[in-house]
Amino acid sequence: MNSGVCLCVLMAVLAAGALTQPVPPADPAGSGLQRAEEAPRRQLRVSQRTDGESRAHLGALLARYIQQARKAPSGRMSIVKNLQNLDPSHRISDRDYMGWMDFGRRSAEEYEYPS
């Protein structure tokens, strides 16, 4: 479930980044003003190129993450397999503890009920 949330957040960030494009000025006044604006525009173009590269890198990372998430075993069986890999002296190797209560019910062997 955490991977799904992370995936949604990552997609939202990428979408927000793609939607925030610079707006061109309505009407530049004079050639002196145009020259003054050209330098920041050049810097903006360079930064947009690096942003595009980082977006491509993020896209590649996202594709690898999705691929790994599909390959990874999930659910109860993967947990059981991981527990089977524990060494036999580990405390939870067999998942059967002394005094374990199943959903709040005690086992019938522990208590004698009056008849």
UniProtKB/Swiss-Prot annotation:
GO terms for molecular function: hormone activity; neuropeptide hormone activity; peptide hormone receptor binding. Its main location: secreted. Residues 23-52 are annotated as: Disordered. Residues 21-44, 107-115 form a propeptide. Keywords: Amidation, Cleavage on pair of basic residues, Glycoprotein, Hormone, Proteoglycan, Secreted, Signal, Sulfation. Pfam families: Gastrin (PF00918). Detected in cerebrospinal fluid and urine (at protein level). The modification Sulfotyrosine is found at residues 97, 111, 113. InterPro entries: CCK-like, Gastrin/CCK, Gastrin/cholecystokinin_CS. The precursor is cleaved by proteases to produce a number of active cholecystokinins. It is found in: Secreted. One of its GO terms (biological process) is eating behavior. GO terms for cellular component: axon; extracellular region; extracellular space. Residues 1-20 form the signal peptide. Belongs to the gastrin/cholecystokinin family. Binds to CCK-A receptors in the pancreas and CCK-B receptors in the brain. This peptide hormone induces gall bladder contraction and the release of pancreatic enzymes in the gut. Its function in the brain is not clear. Binding to CCK-A receptors stimulates amylase release from the pancreas, binding to CCK-B receptors stimulates gastric acid secretion. This is Cholecystokinin. It comes from Homo sapiens.
